[in-house]
UniProtKB/Swiss-Prot annotation:
Its EC number is 4.1.1.37. One of its GO terms (biological process) is protoporphyrinogen IX biosynthetic process. This is Uroporphyrinogen decarboxylase. NCBIfam families: hemE (TIGR01464). Substrate binds at R28, Q29, A30, G31, R32, D78, Y155, S210, H325. It comes from Gloeothece citriformis (strain PCC 7424). Keywords: Cytoplasm, Decarboxylase, Lyase, Porphyrin biosynthesis. The lineage of its organism: Bacteria, Bacillati, Cyanobacteriota, Cyanophyceae, Oscillatoriophycideae. Pathway: Porphyrin-containing compound metabolism; protoporphyrin-IX biosynthesis; coproporphyrinogen-III from 5-aminolevulinate: step 4/4. PANTHER family: METHYLTETRAHYDROFOLATE:HOMOCYSTEINE METHYLTRANSFERASE RELATED (PTHR21091), UROPORPHYRINOGEN DECARBOXYLASE (PTHR21091:SF169). HAMAP family: URO_D (MF_00218). It is found in: Cytoplasm.
Length: 353
Protein backbone atom coordinates (compact mmCIF):
# COMPACT_ATOMS: atom_id res chain seq x y z
CA UNK A 1 0.00 0.00 0.00
CA UNK A 2 1.34 3.43 -0.90
CA UNK A 3 1.88 6.00 1.80
CA UNK A 4 -0.84 8.27 0.38
CA UNK A 5 -3.34 5.39 0.50
CA UNK A 6 -2.64 5.01 4.21
CA UNK A 7 -3.56 8.64 4.87
CA UNK A 8 -7.34 9.22 5.05
CA UNK A 9 -8.64 11.00 1.96
CA UNK A 10 -10.04 14.05 3.76
CA UNK A 11 -6.77 14.57 5.58
CA UNK A 12 -4.95 14.62 2.25
CA UNK A 13 -7.24 17.43 1.04
CA UNK A 14 -6.80 19.33 4.29
CA UNK A 15 -3.03 19.15 3.74
CA UNK A 16 -3.38 20.61 0.25
CA UNK A 17 -2.86 17.60 -2.03
CA UNK A 18 -4.18 17.71 -5.61
CA UNK A 19 -6.98 15.11 -5.78
CA UNK A 20 -9.27 13.67 -8.47
CA UNK A 21 -12.33 14.60 -6.42
CA UNK A 22 -12.86 16.46 -3.16
CA UNK A 23 -13.57 14.48 0.01
CA UNK A 24 -17.11 14.93 1.28
CA UNK A 25 -18.94 15.04 4.59
CA UNK A 26 -21.85 17.11 5.93
CA UNK A 27 -22.27 19.32 8.93
CA UNK A 28 -24.97 17.75 11.12
CA UNK A 29 -24.73 14.56 9.08
CA UNK A 30 -25.77 12.75 12.27
CA UNK A 31 -29.15 14.10 13.25
CA UNK A 32 -32.87 14.43 13.03
CA UNK A 33 -33.27 13.87 9.28
CA UNK A 34 -32.22 10.22 9.85
CA UNK A 35 -34.86 7.77 11.03
CA UNK A 36 -32.33 5.75 13.03
CA UNK A 37 -31.43 8.92 14.93
CA UNK A 38 -35.07 9.81 15.62
CA UNK A 39 -35.69 6.28 16.91
CA UNK A 40 -32.75 6.59 19.28
CA UNK A 41 -33.84 10.07 20.35
CA UNK A 42 -37.28 8.70 21.25
CA UNK A 43 -35.58 6.19 23.53
CA UNK A 44 -33.13 8.74 25.00
CA UNK A 45 -34.89 12.13 24.91
CA UNK A 46 -32.14 14.08 26.71
CA UNK A 47 -29.74 15.67 24.23
CA UNK A 48 -27.03 15.88 26.86
CA UNK A 49 -27.34 12.16 27.54
CA UNK A 50 -27.09 11.43 23.82
CA UNK A 51 -23.99 13.59 23.47
CA UNK A 52 -22.27 12.85 26.80
CA UNK A 53 -22.97 9.13 27.15
CA UNK A 54 -20.04 7.74 25.18
CA UNK A 55 -21.87 4.66 23.86
CA UNK A 56 -24.78 6.75 22.56
CA UNK A 57 -22.55 9.45 21.06
CA UNK A 58 -20.43 6.81 19.31
CA UNK A 59 -23.53 5.12 17.90
CA UNK A 60 -24.95 8.43 16.64
CA UNK A 61 -21.62 9.53 15.15
CA UNK A 62 -21.42 6.24 13.23
CA UNK A 63 -25.01 6.26 11.92
CA UNK A 64 -24.17 8.36 8.83
CA UNK A 65 -20.90 6.46 8.39
CA UNK A 66 -22.77 3.18 8.11
CA UNK A 67 -25.42 4.68 5.84
CA UNK A 68 -23.34 6.83 3.47
CA UNK A 69 -19.59 6.27 4.08
CA UNK A 70 -18.64 9.97 4.16
CA UNK A 71 -14.95 10.87 4.01
CA UNK A 72 -15.29 12.58 7.39
CA UNK A 73 -16.91 11.31 10.60
CA UNK A 74 -17.49 14.08 13.13
CA UNK A 75 -17.93 13.47 16.83
CA UNK A 76 -21.55 13.91 17.88
CA UNK A 77 -21.47 16.58 20.56
CA UNK A 78 -22.46 20.18 21.27
CA UNK A 79 -20.39 23.34 21.26
CA UNK A 80 -21.48 24.02 24.87
CA UNK A 81 -20.24 20.64 26.16
CA UNK A 82 -17.05 21.98 27.83
CA UNK A 83 -18.70 24.96 29.58
CA UNK A 84 -19.56 23.18 32.88
CA UNK A 85 -15.86 22.35 33.08
CA UNK A 86 -15.05 26.00 33.79
CA UNK A 87 -18.12 26.68 35.92
CA UNK A 88 -20.88 27.52 33.43
CA UNK A 89 -23.64 24.90 33.71
CA UNK A 90 -26.16 24.54 30.90
CA UNK A 91 -29.11 22.45 29.83
CA UNK A 92 -30.61 21.76 26.42
CA UNK A 93 -34.39 21.80 26.16
CA UNK A 94 -35.80 19.88 23.20
CA UNK A 95 -37.19 22.33 20.58
CA UNK A 96 -36.00 25.32 22.67
CA UNK A 97 -32.26 24.85 22.57
CA UNK A 98 -29.58 25.65 25.16
CA UNK A 99 -30.37 27.38 28.45
CA UNK A 100 -27.69 28.89 30.71
CA UNK A 101 -29.17 29.97 34.03
CA UNK A 102 -27.90 32.13 35.56
CA UNK A 103 -26.31 33.81 32.54
CA UNK A 104 -22.78 35.23 32.92
CA UNK A 105 -23.07 39.01 33.16
CA UNK A 106 -20.95 40.25 36.07
CA UNK A 107 -17.29 40.64 36.95
CA UNK A 108 -17.81 38.45 40.01
CA UNK A 109 -19.16 35.57 37.89
CA UNK A 110 -16.21 35.81 35.50
CA UNK A 111 -13.76 35.86 38.43
CA UNK A 112 -15.28 32.60 39.68
CA UNK A 113 -14.64 30.71 36.42
CA UNK A 114 -11.89 28.14 36.83
CA UNK A 115 -9.35 26.48 34.49
CA UNK A 116 -10.53 23.67 32.24
CA UNK A 117 -9.44 20.10 33.01
CA UNK A 118 -10.86 17.94 30.20
CA UNK A 119 -9.82 14.61 31.72
CA UNK A 120 -11.87 15.43 34.80
CA UNK A 121 -14.86 17.14 33.17
CA UNK A 122 -15.30 15.62 29.68
CA UNK A 123 -13.67 12.15 29.91
CA UNK A 124 -16.35 10.72 27.61
CA UNK A 125 -14.79 12.69 24.73
CA UNK A 126 -11.67 10.51 24.92
CA UNK A 127 -13.76 7.35 24.70
CA UNK A 128 -15.81 8.71 21.79
CA UNK A 129 -12.85 9.83 19.69
CA UNK A 130 -10.65 6.80 20.34
CA UNK A 131 -13.51 4.47 19.44
CA UNK A 132 -14.38 6.38 16.27
CA UNK A 133 -10.76 6.12 15.13
CA UNK A 134 -10.84 2.37 15.72
CA UNK A 135 -14.16 1.99 13.90
CA UNK A 136 -13.32 3.89 10.71
CA UNK A 137 -9.58 3.22 10.49
CA UNK A 138 -8.09 4.87 7.40
CA UNK A 139 -11.41 4.68 5.54
CA UNK A 140 -12.51 8.05 6.91
CA UNK A 141 -11.15 11.00 8.86
CA UNK A 142 -12.31 11.66 12.43
CA UNK A 143 -13.21 15.29 13.07
CA UNK A 144 -13.47 16.98 16.42
CA UNK A 145 -15.29 20.23 16.91
CA UNK A 146 -15.54 23.16 19.26
CA UNK A 147 -17.34 26.46 19.60
CA UNK A 148 -15.35 29.66 19.20
CA UNK A 149 -15.04 32.16 22.07
CA UNK A 150 -17.46 34.81 20.73
CA UNK A 151 -20.23 32.29 20.11
CA UNK A 152 -19.75 30.59 23.48
CA UNK A 153 -19.79 34.01 25.15
CA UNK A 154 -22.99 34.88 23.28
CA UNK A 155 -24.72 31.84 24.75
CA UNK A 156 -23.25 32.43 28.22
CA UNK A 157 -24.20 36.12 28.38
CA UNK A 158 -27.58 35.89 26.66
CA UNK A 159 -28.47 32.72 28.56
CA UNK A 160 -30.03 31.18 25.44
CA UNK A 161 -30.21 31.54 21.68
CA UNK A 162 -31.04 35.03 20.50
CA UNK A 163 -32.22 36.78 17.36
CA UNK A 164 -30.71 40.16 18.23
CA UNK A 165 -27.81 39.46 20.64
CA UNK A 166 -28.70 42.72 22.35
CA UNK A 167 -27.47 41.65 25.80
CA UNK A 168 -23.96 40.65 24.76
CA UNK A 169 -23.75 43.64 22.42
CA UNK A 170 -24.76 45.87 25.32
CA UNK A 171 -21.88 44.39 27.32
CA UNK A 172 -19.51 44.72 24.34
CA UNK A 173 -20.36 48.37 23.75
CA UNK A 174 -20.74 49.55 27.36
CA UNK A 175 -18.54 47.23 29.47
CA UNK A 176 -16.00 45.86 26.98
CA UNK A 177 -13.35 45.14 29.62
CA UNK A 178 -15.62 42.59 31.30
CA UNK A 179 -16.44 40.88 28.01
CA UNK A 180 -12.78 40.74 26.96
CA UNK A 181 -11.94 38.91 30.20
CA UNK A 182 -14.68 36.37 29.51
CA UNK A 183 -13.58 35.92 25.89
CA UNK A 184 -9.96 35.36 26.90
CA UNK A 185 -10.92 32.74 29.50
CA UNK A 186 -13.12 31.02 26.94
CA UNK A 187 -10.29 31.08 24.38
CA UNK A 188 -7.97 29.35 26.84
CA UNK A 189 -10.66 26.73 27.48
CA UNK A 190 -11.31 26.18 23.77
CA UNK A 191 -7.59 25.81 23.00
CA UNK A 192 -7.22 23.26 25.79
CA UNK A 193 -10.29 21.40 24.50
CA UNK A 194 -8.97 21.32 20.92
CA UNK A 195 -5.62 19.95 22.09
CA UNK A 196 -7.41 17.32 24.16
CA UNK A 197 -9.54 16.25 21.20
CA UNK A 198 -6.44 15.90 19.02
CA UNK A 199 -4.66 13.88 21.70
CA UNK A 200 -7.71 11.62 21.91
CA UNK A 201 -7.82 10.92 18.18
CA UNK A 202 -9.31 13.86 16.26
CA UNK A 203 -7.39 14.25 13.00
CA UNK A 204 -9.01 17.56 12.02
CA UNK A 205 -10.90 19.99 14.28
CA UNK A 206 -13.58 22.42 13.12
CA UNK A 207 -14.27 25.56 15.16
CA UNK A 208 -17.77 26.99 14.88
CA UNK A 209 -18.15 30.72 15.44
CA UNK A 210 -21.80 30.43 14.54
CA UNK A 211 -22.87 33.87 15.73
CA UNK A 212 -19.85 35.94 14.66
CA UNK A 213 -21.74 36.78 11.48
CA UNK A 214 -23.96 38.96 13.70
CA UNK A 215 -21.05 41.36 14.22
CA UNK A 216 -20.09 44.28 12.01
CA UNK A 217 -16.67 43.76 10.42
CA UNK A 218 -15.11 46.35 12.75
CA UNK A 219 -16.61 44.66 15.83
CA UNK A 220 -15.55 41.24 14.50
CA UNK A 221 -11.98 42.56 14.54
CA UNK A 222 -12.33 43.42 18.23
CA UNK A 223 -14.49 40.69 19.76
CA UNK A 224 -14.18 37.60 17.52
CA UNK A 225 -10.96 37.55 15.51
CA UNK A 226 -8.44 38.11 18.35
CA UNK A 227 -9.89 35.21 20.33
CA UNK A 228 -10.01 32.89 17.31
CA UNK A 229 -6.33 33.78 16.90
CA UNK A 230 -5.67 33.09 20.59
CA UNK A 231 -7.14 29.59 20.21
CA UNK A 232 -5.26 28.81 17.00
CA UNK A 233 -1.96 30.16 18.34
CA UNK A 234 -2.12 27.99 21.46
CA UNK A 235 -3.12 24.87 19.51
CA UNK A 236 -0.44 25.33 16.85
CA UNK A 237 2.24 25.66 19.54
CA UNK A 238 1.69 22.03 20.52
CA UNK A 239 -0.08 20.51 17.48
CA UNK A 240 1.22 22.39 14.42
CA UNK A 241 0.29 19.68 11.91
CA UNK A 242 -3.39 19.15 12.77
CA UNK A 243 -5.62 21.01 10.29
CA UNK A 244 -8.07 23.48 11.83
CA UNK A 245 -11.25 24.62 10.05
CA UNK A 246 -13.26 27.77 10.90
CA UNK A 247 -16.98 28.05 10.11
CA UNK A 248 -19.20 31.10 10.51
CA UNK A 249 -22.84 31.29 9.46
CA UNK A 250 -23.53 34.44 7.44
CA UNK A 251 -19.86 35.09 6.84
CA UNK A 252 -19.94 36.99 3.53
CA UNK A 253 -19.04 40.28 5.21
CA UNK A 254 -16.07 38.91 7.17
CA UNK A 255 -14.66 36.26 4.84
CA UNK A 256 -11.22 37.83 4.42
CA UNK A 257 -11.05 38.44 8.16
CA UNK A 258 -11.71 34.74 8.79
CA UNK A 259 -8.56 34.04 6.81
CA UNK A 260 -6.56 36.07 9.35
CA UNK A 261 -7.52 33.69 12.18
CA UNK A 262 -4.60 31.37 11.49
CA UNK A 263 -6.73 28.33 10.62
CA UNK A 264 -5.82 26.06 7.72
CA UNK A 265 -9.23 26.00 6.06
CA UNK A 266 -12.32 28.22 5.86
CA UNK A 267 -15.75 26.57 5.73
CA UNK A 268 -17.73 28.86 3.43
CA UNK A 269 -21.48 29.29 3.85
CA UNK A 270 -23.80 29.21 0.85
CA UNK A 271 -24.34 32.99 0.65
CA UNK A 272 -20.96 33.39 -1.07
CA UNK A 273 -20.27 32.00 -4.55
CA UNK A 274 -17.43 29.48 -4.22
CA UNK A 275 -15.43 31.05 -7.05
CA UNK A 276 -15.70 34.42 -5.31
CA UNK A 277 -14.73 32.86 -1.98
CA UNK A 278 -11.62 31.38 -3.57
CA UNK A 279 -10.70 34.76 -5.01
CA UNK A 280 -11.30 36.65 -1.77
CA UNK A 281 -9.43 34.16 0.43
CA UNK A 282 -6.44 33.71 -1.86
CA UNK A 283 -5.02 30.57 -3.40
CA UNK A 284 -3.11 29.52 -0.27
CA UNK A 285 -6.25 29.18 1.88
CA UNK A 286 -8.07 25.86 1.69
CA UNK A 287 -11.88 25.87 1.59
CA UNK A 288 -14.81 23.70 2.62
CA UNK A 289 -18.39 23.88 1.41
CA UNK A 290 -20.57 25.35 0.29
CA UNK A 291 -23.79 23.88 -1.09
CA UNK A 292 -27.07 25.38 0.15
CA UNK A 293 -28.67 22.74 2.42
CA UNK A 294 -31.96 23.52 0.66
CA UNK A 295 -30.53 21.99 -2.52
CA UNK A 296 -31.07 18.58 -0.91
CA UNK A 297 -34.81 19.14 -1.23
CA UNK A 298 -34.38 19.42 -5.01
CA UNK A 299 -34.38 16.90 -7.84
CA UNK A 300 -31.45 14.54 -8.29
CA UNK A 301 -30.37 16.30 -11.47
CA UNK A 302 -30.38 19.64 -9.62
CA UNK A 303 -28.32 18.19 -6.77
CA UNK A 304 -25.86 16.72 -9.27
CA UNK A 305 -25.51 20.02 -11.14
CA UNK A 306 -24.81 21.95 -7.93
CA UNK A 307 -22.18 19.43 -6.84
CA UNK A 308 -20.37 19.71 -10.18
CA UNK A 309 -20.65 23.51 -10.19
CA UNK A 310 -19.23 23.82 -6.67
CA UNK A 311 -16.35 21.42 -7.33
CA UNK A 312 -15.39 23.22 -10.53
CA UNK A 313 -15.38 26.60 -8.82
CA UNK A 314 -13.35 25.30 -5.87
CA UNK A 315 -10.74 23.53 -7.98
CA UNK A 316 -8.93 20.24 -7.35
CA UNK A 317 -6.66 21.30 -4.51
CA UNK A 318 -7.48 22.18 -0.91
CA UNK A 319 -11.26 21.68 -1.08
CA UNK A 320 -13.61 19.58 1.05
CA UNK A 321 -17.14 19.32 -0.32
CA UNK A 322 -19.75 20.10 2.31
CA UNK A 323 -22.93 22.06 2.79
CA UNK A 324 -22.86 25.75 3.63
CA UNK A 325 -24.69 24.96 6.88
CA UNK A 326 -25.97 21.86 8.67
CA UNK A 327 -28.36 19.36 7.10
CA UNK A 328 -31.91 20.63 7.56
CA UNK A 329 -34.55 18.72 9.50
CA UNK A 330 -36.85 16.95 7.06
CA UNK A 331 -34.21 16.50 4.37
CA UNK A 332 -35.03 13.28 2.46
CA UNK A 333 -32.54 10.57 3.39
CA UNK A 334 -32.54 9.30 -0.18
CA UNK A 335 -31.33 12.71 -1.36
CA UNK A 336 -28.54 12.68 1.22
CA UNK A 337 -27.55 9.23 -0.03
CA UNK A 338 -27.61 10.49 -3.62
CA UNK A 339 -25.50 13.49 -2.61
CA UNK A 340 -22.79 11.28 -1.12
CA UNK A 341 -22.85 8.75 -3.98
CA UNK A 342 -22.62 11.53 -6.55
CA UNK A 343 -19.88 13.38 -4.71
CA UNK A 344 -17.80 10.23 -4.33
CA UNK A 345 -18.02 9.65 -8.09
CA UNK A 346 -17.45 13.28 -8.97
CA UNK A 347 -14.21 12.52 -10.82
CA UNK A 348 -16.29 10.65 -13.43
CA UNK A 349 -18.87 13.43 -13.60
CA UNK A 350 -16.22 16.07 -14.15
CA UNK A 351 -14.73 14.09 -17.05
CA UNK A 352 -18.08 13.65 -18.82
CA UNK A 353 -19.79 16.93 -17.94
Amino acid sequence: MSQSAEIPYLLRAARGEVLDRPPVWMMRQAGRYMKVYRDLRDKYPSFRERSENADLAIEISLQPWRAFQPDGVIMFSDILTPLPGIGIPFDIIESKGPIIDPPIRTQQQIDHLHPFDPDQTVPFVKTILKTLRQEVGNQSTVLGFVGAPWTLAAYAVEGKSSKTYSIIKSMAFSEPAILHQLLSKLADMVASYVRYQIDCGAQVVQMFDSWAGQLTPQDYDVFALPYQQQVVRQVKETHPDTPLILYISGSAGVLERMGKSGVDMISVDWTVDMAEARQRLGKEMKVQGNIDPGVLFGSQSFIRDRIVDTIRKAGNQGHILNLGHGVLVGTPEDNVRFFFETAKNADQLLVHA
